[in-house]
């Protein structure tokens, strides 16, 4: 246990005056759940923690590739004091992502299962009274193929800001997004799980001291994309009231596709199923064991690009798909028509989104590759289907970003900047503009800080890598300790911004730097060692790419994987 955050888990009755005299038990629609009290040093009010609360039936058997169903009721007091298994995924990659991003001091050993539709709740409310605190529902990232709830401890955010934090899980990879493109398996099962979790929150969170009329959804990377999809989805209407997308939106390249039939057929073939009809593929894949589907997952080499063979046969993600249910139309069309959930919205990116963690996990560009403009052009052409770039646009982009330098390290940095702009920067600004133009209150930020928790393998020049803001949002400097006063204050400031937004739909508050609304002046906040206002985030890049991509037929990049 670190000096800065001694976490006391009270598994017996409290003895101190004013503390609860027994463990927390709360009623849900399905039955009673037993939690535990946890306190953060320096705070008298403990947080009641409930881990592994079921919000849907286990998605097994005929419920594989099917919408989630309500959890079965129980008549006993369910013990919810230990972490649920994460949804099925590559266990090695899953552990790596957990260890890189967690705000825990200790690395926890993870378990994985197809039976994974559970959520974790952290509530500072006095459960003997009818508190109605703001609710913040976190949707984890991981490319829709990795990640889980228990990486993120909501204790610091909940304690410091007096909010109820709910961390949800959703089916991933083949289990979560397998789509034949028709009624046999429409896909987006993971997004339907997210919607089911939000319904559960509406039905139950008041018993945990939360206000079902003040729910903020927030997420990072594929979690940010999920938040953006839910903002655009008619299914999620009235299930949340504010939204925050960190480093991921519904226009993020590679995460949303119009049609994933070729991938469905590849999954079937790799699994040893016939791919002749949708019905036969779904029937055969439902007979496979969880271990067999995991074997298929590993053979698909998710999160990596095949730069030697036909790159169109390389699938780094099993993406969100146009299903006519979660997404009635492509995100671009929904944004243009201004027909979506116009809740207050924070959208942000990090300064070097493709700085280290993503290139390392995807081995893209290959670490041993000497980069010159010709090599960079070839590399981008091999991944143009993923980045949604027309091949004819690539030489123009390489010329703009690489600027004719002979230094391979400089070329690599510029290529990483190009990819970061295409995948994260430009789409985030376009979504923010669309949200603003629909009349909704919008805020933008760019995170510019290198956390002390960064991997020792990360080059010291990488500041504001993908995922770096999570440490601050979840209070890692407070929970893990051993960091500077500057980093602790940055975390406290970000938690305050996020929680103010959850309370009021506006991040501003006393003692904080002013965060301008993202209006026609396009003011935004640069968050880091120095936090200050700026204007027109990525304006030149958005103009460049918009002009360049105007030569591309509408949605051409979405027609196939």
Curated annotation (Swiss-Prot):
MF terms in GO? all-trans-retinyl-palmitate hydrolase, all-trans-retinol forming activity; carboxylesterase activity; carboxylic ester hydrolase activity; retinyl-palmitate esterase activity
Catalytic site: 221, 353, 466
Similarity remark: Belongs to the type-B carboxylesterase/lipase family.
Entries under Pfam families matching the protein: COesterase (PF00135)
Protein name per UniProt:
Carboxylesterase 1E
Q: Which terms does the UniProt entry file under GO BP?
A: lipid catabolic process; retinoid metabolic process
Q: Which PANTHER family match?
A: CARBOXYLESTERASE (PTHR11559)
Tell me its EC number(s), please: 3.1.1.1
Q: Which Gene3D superfamilies match?
A: alpha/beta hydrolase
| Major site of localization recorded for this protein | endoplasmic reticulum
Reaction catalyzed: a carboxylic ester + H2O = an alcohol + a carboxylate + H(+); all-trans-retinyl hexadecanoate + H2O = all-trans-retinol + hexadecanoate + H(+)
**Tissue expr:** Expressed in liver.
Supply the alphabetized keyword list. Answer: Disulfide bond, Endoplasmic reticulum, Glycoprotein, Hydrolase, Lipid metabolism, Membrane, Microsome, Serine esterase, Signal
- Bridged cysteine pairs (disulfide): 87-116, 273-284
Q: Where in the cell is it found?
A: Endoplasmic reticulum lumen; Microsome membrane
């Amino acid at each position: 246990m670190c000096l800065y955050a001694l976490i006391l888990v009270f598994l017996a009755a409290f003895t101190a005056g004013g503390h609860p005299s027994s463990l927390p038990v709360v009623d849900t629609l399905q039955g009673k759940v037993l939690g535990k009290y946890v306190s953060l040093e320096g705070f008298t009010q403990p947080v009641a923690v409930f881990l592994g609360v079921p919000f849907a039936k286990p998605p097994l058997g005929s419920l594989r590739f099917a919408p989630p169903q309500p959890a079965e009721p129980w008549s006993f007091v369910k013990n919810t004091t230990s972490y649920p298994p994460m949804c099925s995924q590559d266990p090695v990659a899953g552990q790596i992502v957990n260890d890189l991003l967690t705000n825990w001091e200790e690395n926890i050993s993870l378990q994985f299962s197809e039976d994974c539709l559970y959520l974790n709740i952290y509530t500072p409310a006095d459960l003997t009274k009818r508190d109605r605190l703001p609710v913040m529902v976190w949707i984890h990232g991981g490319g829709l193929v990795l990640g889980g709830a228990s990486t993120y401890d909501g204790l610091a955010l909940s304690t410091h800001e007096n909010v109820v934090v709910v961390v949800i899980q959703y089916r991933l990879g083949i289990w979560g997004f397998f789509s034949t493109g028709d009624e046999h398996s429409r896909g987006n099962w993971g997004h339907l799980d997210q919607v089911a979790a939000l319904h559960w929150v509406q039905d139950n969170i008041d018993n945990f001291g939360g206000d079902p009329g003040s729910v903020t959804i927030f997420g990072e990377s594929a979690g940010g994309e999920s938040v953006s999809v839910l903002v655009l989805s008619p299914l999620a209407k009235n299930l949340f009231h504010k939204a925050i997308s960190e480093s991921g939106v519904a226009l993020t390249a590679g995460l949303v596709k119009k049609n994933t039939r070729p991938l469905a057929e590849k999954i079937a073939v790799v699994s040893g199923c016939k791919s002749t009809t949708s019905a036969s593929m779904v029937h055969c894949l439902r007979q496979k064991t969880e271990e067999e589907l995991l074997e298929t997952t590993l053979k698909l080499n998710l999160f990596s690009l095949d730069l030697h063979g036909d790159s169109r046969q390389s699938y780094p993600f099993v993406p969100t798909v146009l299903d006519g249910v979660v997404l009635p139309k492509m995100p671009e069309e929904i944004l243009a028509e201004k027909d979506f959930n116009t809740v207050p919205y924070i959208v942000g990116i990090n300064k070097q989104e493709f700085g280290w963690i993503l290139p390392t996990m995807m081995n893209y560009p290959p670490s041993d590759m000497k980069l010159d403009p010709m090599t960079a052009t070839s590399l981008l052409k091999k991944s143009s289907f993923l980045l949604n770039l027309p091949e004819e646009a690539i030489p123009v982009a390489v010329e703009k970003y690489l600027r004719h330098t002979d230094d391979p390290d400089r070329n690599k940095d510029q290529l990483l900047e190009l990819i970061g702009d295409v995948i994260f920067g430009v789409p985030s600004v376009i979504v923010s503009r669309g949200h603003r133009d629909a009349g909704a209150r919008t805020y933008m930020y760019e995170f510019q800080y290198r956390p002390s928790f960064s991997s020792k393998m990360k080059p010291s020049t990488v500041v504001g890598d993908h995922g770096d803001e999570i440490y601050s949002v979840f209070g890692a400097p407070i929970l893990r300790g051993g960091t500077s006063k500057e980093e602790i204050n940055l975390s406290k400031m970000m938690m305050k911004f996020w929680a103010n937004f959850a309370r009021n739909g506006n991040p501003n508050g006393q003692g904080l730097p002013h965060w301008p609304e993202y209006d026609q002046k396009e003011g935004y906040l640069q968050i880091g060692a120095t936090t200050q206002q700026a204007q027109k985030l990525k304006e030149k890049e958005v103009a460049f790419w918009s002009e360049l991509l105007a030569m591309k037929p509408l949605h051409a990049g979405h027609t196939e994987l």
